[in-house]
């Protein structure tokens, strides 16, 4: 997407920092990061196009993130370090703005008209 340079750089920086810290702190602590997708903090249940665009068929909620954080803090994740875990319902695996559900990308080209 155009005009997302700062967002993209920040996301990349988090991933790189996670990897570097996992190496630097190896043997003392495990370091992982979580990159959430669309998370509704009002616990509203979205239907229609909002949910349909998600490969899992729903918008995420805070418990999706909390459950991963709890897992990463547990011994069950004892062999996981240096990972950036994407919790986005599969959105990073598909094109968001494909217009199947009426979603379009506003390029901003006509803003001065």
Question: How would you name each of these model-derived features?
Answer:
Residues 33, 49-80, 87-89, 113:
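C-terminal helical subdomain
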Residues 7, 15:
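Catalytic tyrosine of NAD(P)H-dependent dehydrogenase/reductases that use a Tyr as the general acid/base
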Residues 2, 27-29, 83:
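Active-site loop of short-chain dehydrogenase/reductase
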Residues 3, 33-55, 94-113:
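A glycine/serine/threonine-rich, flexible loop-to-helix segment
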Residues 23-27, 78:
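Alpha-helical segment proximal to the catalytic Tyr-Lys
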Residues 17, 25, 68-72:
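Generic leucine side-chain signal with a strong bias for well-ordered alpha-helical environments
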Residues 10, 18:
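Active-site helix of classical SDR
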């Amino acid at each position: 997407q155009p005009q997302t340079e700062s967002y993209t750089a920040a996301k990349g920086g988090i991933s790189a920092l996670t990897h570097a810290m996992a190496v630097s702190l190896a043997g003392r602590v495990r370091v992982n990061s979580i990159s959430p997708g669309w998370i509704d903090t009002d616990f509203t249940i979205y239907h229609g196009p909002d949910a349909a665009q998600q490969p899992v068929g729903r918008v995420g909620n805070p418990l999706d993130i909390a459950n991963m954080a709890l897992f990463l803090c547990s011994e069950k994740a004892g062999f996981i370090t240096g990972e950036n875990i994407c919790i986005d319902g599969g959105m990073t695996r598909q094109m968001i703005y494909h217009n199947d559900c009426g979603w379009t990308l506003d390029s901003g080209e006509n803003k001065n008209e």
